[in-house]
């Protein structure tokens, strides 16, 4: 990958690695807390971002999700985190006021179409 900025950062890039179950549960809890904060702040709707190489999209992608656990492999497993987050969000927020942003454009090869059809 190329450098996206000519400005030097004091933060070193981290080597990608699979998340463990505890880290995944922390992430799900973080999504819940974020939605609780949005509700308290008076937001009327929320959008769960699962596109543009954000974390949830990385779990959906064959290219980035090459693990061998319950979150990898089949479409059902790769979508598991997305649905776990949605389950937690709908405990706090009305489902009809939650949108999900999906984008298959960054996937290569394109078995992603089947993934998105399954999710929707």
Predicted region positions:
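Aromatic- and acidic-residue-enriched carbohydrate-binding clefts of CAZyme catalytic domains
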Residues: 1-18, 58-79
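Non-globular sequence segments
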Residues: 1-36, 41
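Surface-exposed cleft-lining segments at the edges of enzyme active sites
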Residues: 32, 39, 68-76, 109-111
């Amino acid at each position: 990958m190329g450098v996206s900025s000519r400005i030097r950062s004091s933060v070193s890039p981290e080597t990608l690695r699979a998340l463990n179950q505890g880290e995944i549960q922390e992430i799900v809890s973080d999504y819940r807390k974020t939605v609780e904060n949005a509700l308290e702040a008076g937001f009327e709707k929320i959008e769960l971002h699962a596109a543009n190489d954000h974390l949830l999209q990385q779990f959906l992608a064959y290219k980035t999700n090459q693990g061998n656990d319950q979150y990898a492999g089949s479409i059902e497993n790769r979508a598991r985190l997305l649905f776990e987050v949605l389950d937690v969000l709908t405990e706090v927020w009305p489902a009809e006021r939650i949108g999900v942003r999906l984008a298959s454009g960054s996937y290569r090869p394109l078995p992603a179409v089947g993934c998105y059809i399954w999710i929707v």
